[in-house]
Amino acid sequence: GNALEVTSTGFQLKSTSSGFNGSSASYVYMAIRRGPLAAPTDATKVFHVNQQNNADTFSVGFPTDLALVAKTGGSSSNAVVGSRLTGDDKFLVTSGTDAEASSSSIFTFDLQNSFKQGFSTSAENVSWLWGRAPSYFDCICYSGTGSNRTVSHNLGAVPEMMWIKCRSNTDNWAVFHKDTGATKVIFLNNDIAASTLSTRFNDTAPTSSVFTVGTDAEVNGSGRTYIAYLFASVDGVSKVGSYTGNGASTQTIDCGFSSGARFVLLKRTDATDEWYVFDSVWGIVSGNDPFLTMNTTNA
């Protein structure tokens, strides 16, 4: 088995071998932080969108840490999520509560500047890919305790949006957003409004070093395993925000970008509605732009 596993803040020894982790033995080590050491200034270095047919390898320009892939034609299909941390054959579906599943080579993350998705369907697929970078995006795995606790992260900024999913068991995707606050949770796999539930984030906003989870099994069940995706705003690169609708045919939301948005995810929080995704591959141009929904199988 693996002797060492990378964590969000360093590494974890997974062996009792005297060469790595002997009882009361002394060791020295050197470790170098992965990835960029500064917040990104160019979105193309940390985010990529691509549309392709069937299984395909394509250039990304950076190591992919999070992949969100959806079928855009043909019969209905779930959008699926994979990460470098959990490996090439593991995935979660965004429209359901299923535990993490396996499928041989559904993703290939071990490529320096490319990515491969292994879907073998006759329909086109769209891939949205993130690379970890300070103040922009981080991805961590942790184990639940069943008691209120904090979880360390390496985002280097206060997370403004978090997606948390239990990997080991069936349960909802719990979403934190800075503008709905830590007293409420939104469910990525559901269309319901933001719900006031203190057992998800223990009514405690995240900080630049930790986020808090409550006692609910969706985020912190004893003996369960979880993955958390953390997002924050970087001027000119990414924006996490909110707005109030005006009911008119036109409303402009200023994200501070100089060349427009390539990806937009939005969800109504005060009433029932879907999680909508728009992107530049399909064309963010007019009010009739096509979209996908994260919480349904109707891509």
Region roles according to the model:
Residues 1-299:
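Surface-exposed molecular-recognition determinants
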